[in-house]
Design a protein with these regions (language model features):
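N-terminal Rossmann NAD(P)H-binding glycine-rich loop of SDR-like oxidoreductase domains
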Residues: 3-23
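Alpha-helical substrate-binding/gating segment
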Residues: 176, 180-191, 198-232
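C-terminal amphipathic/interface module of NAD(P)-dependent oxidoreductases
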Residues: 218, 269-304
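Glycine/proline-rich active-site loop of Rossmann-fold NAD(P)-dependent oxidoreductases
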Residues: 139, 151-153, 163-179, 215-225
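Conserved Rossmann-fold NAD(P)-dependent oxidoreductase catalytic core, especially the SDR/UDP-sugar
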Residues: 90-132
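NAD(P)H-binding glycine-rich loop region in Rossmannoid oxidoreductase-like domains
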Residues: 35-91
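Mid/C-terminal beta-alpha module of Rossmann-like enzyme folds, strongest
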Residues: 212-213, 218-266, 300-303
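Conserved beta-loop-beta element that borders a ligand/cofactor-binding pocket
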Residues: 110, 143-166
Length: 304
């Protein structure tokens, strides 16, 4: 199988590329101007891509996107987050749609933020979208693949939860919500639940995230797929489990107003103080088996 990956240098993309190469697949990255790596040249900001080089792939995986939680959501930052996902996906979708030999599948990133703040409701792939910037982003992100869908390409929307990796993403930010990791509250024994601690945090181990993407490549599933473990936890339980793995106390709560002051209200609410009790219905029904089904195992794998 020949697979092109956009975002192959990221935390998830790099592990996915290695996993596919390890089983004998041909993996080619999509590379931006100035990259020293060989691959399919593209520049989403300029709307350009090497169309001929995309001919003949079996699948394309698009994980590209500017980091959502690194900076406050100013107007400029919001636009950068939006364009890096929507415009890159539109470029890929319309390019794949006109190829003489298009790929059979486009596996495209999304997020459980699609559902907004779900409260205690169990959210399957058929649950409606929520409100707010992150929900609007995910709705537009998934809609940006429409040209590929109309061309008969099988499209999968990866609605990922919190991917457990100490090297980046939401877990990396949790370890250092107020700055660099060396002043992380958890590493100094000052961590605790954030806000009320009752918000649901859907999570998935990095290993299972990558295995689920490979599963999406190998099977005929299409449409939205919740990439989350079957046992979501509240922020309070997540924090306690993290404290046990790090061997640090978790007795000092972090008030929601502190996060809103530091991060901005919209970012703090969307990424930390709100939650989704998402369920991996499509994965389970399609025969996927999780390696890490409980949060303790997932966190041990992340720090192992």
């Amino acid at each position: 199988m020949r697979v092109a990956i956009a975002g192959s240098s990221g935390v998830i993309g790099s592990v996915l590329a290695a996993a596919l190469a390890g089983r004998g697949e041909e993996v080619i990255p999509l590379v931006r101007p100035g990259s020293s790596s060989n691959g399919v040249a593209w520049d989403p900001s300029a709307g350009t891509i090497d169309t001929r080089a995309l001919e003949g792939f079996d699948a394309v995986v698009n994980l590209a996107g500017h980091s959502i939680g690194e900076r406050r959501w100013t107007a400029v930052e919001r636009q950068r987050i939006w364009d890096s996902r929507i415009e890159s996906t539109r470029l890929l979708a319309r390019t794949l749609a006109v190829l003489e030999h298009p790929p059979a599948a486009l596996i495209n990133a999304s997020a459980v933020g699609y559902y907004g703040d779900g409260g205690d409701s169990i959210l399957s792939e058929t649950s409606p979208s929520g409100s707010g910037f992150l929900a609007d982003l995910c709705v537009a992100w998934e809609a940006a693949t429409e040209r590929a869908v109309r061309a008969g390409i099988r499209v999968v929307h990866l609605r990922s939860g919190i991917v457990l990796s100490k090297d980046g993403g939401a877990l990396g930010r949790l370890l250092a919500p107020f700055g660099p990791r060396w002043i992380s509250p958890f590493r100094w024994g000052l961590g605790g639940p954030v806000g009320g601690g009752r918000q649901w945090w859907p999570w998935i181990s990095l290993d299972d995230e990558v295995r689920a993407i490979v599963h999406a490549l190998d099977t005929g599933i299409s449409g939205p797929v919740n990439l989350v473990a079957p046992a979501p936890v509240t922020n309070r339980d997540f924090t306690r489990a993290l404290g046990r793995v790090l061997r640090r106390p978790t007795i000092l709560p972090i008030p929601g107003f502190v996060l809103r002051l530091l991060l901005g209200s919209e970012l703090a609410d969307a990424l930390v103080l709100e939650g989704q009790r998402a369920a991996p219905v499509v994965l389970i029904e399609s025969g996927f088996e999780f390696e890490h089904s409980d949060i303790a195992a997932g966190l041990r794998a992340a720090f192992g």
